[in-house]
Amino acid sequence: VDCPAGLGETVRCLTQGADLALVVTTPDLAAVRDARRTMQMLAQMNREARLVINRIRPSLIQQGDAPDVDDIIDSVGAQLLGLIPEDALVTPLQNAGVPVIFQTASPAAAQIRDVARRLQGEHRPLRFP
């Protein structure tokens, strides 16, 4: 279930029946803080959760304009399931109603497929975009 950011009762109710929660964040400080609070709430509910970091731009991390992936993992306190790069193909595909996952040239789609395979128990190495 794709839930909004924040910790409303809706998020709490929707995660009640989940076997596993995927906390997806972007590498900006406000989103990471929300992800940390969400992870804390899930821990209080004894829910298993994993972290996916979306829209990663390595150049921003290298310039110090975005938090490092390791810092995000430490802050959120969750096992990393995937790293999805910022991808210029995503917005046009979404606007055209085409699922990104079917775009073989998309770096984001390749990483999303790896996340899905990991969820199914397949070993896929984590690749920094």
Regions found by a protein language model. Name each.
Residues 7, 29-31, 58-60:
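Short, small-residue-enriched loops and turns at beta-alpha junctions
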Residues 10, 34, 64-68:
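Residues at alpha-helix caps and immediate loop-helix transition turns in enzyme cores, especially N-
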Residues 13-14, 41, 72:
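Hydrophobic/aromatic ligand-binding patch that stacks against planar heteroaromatic rings
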Residues 44-129:
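C-terminal lobe/tail of nucleotide-utilizing enzymes
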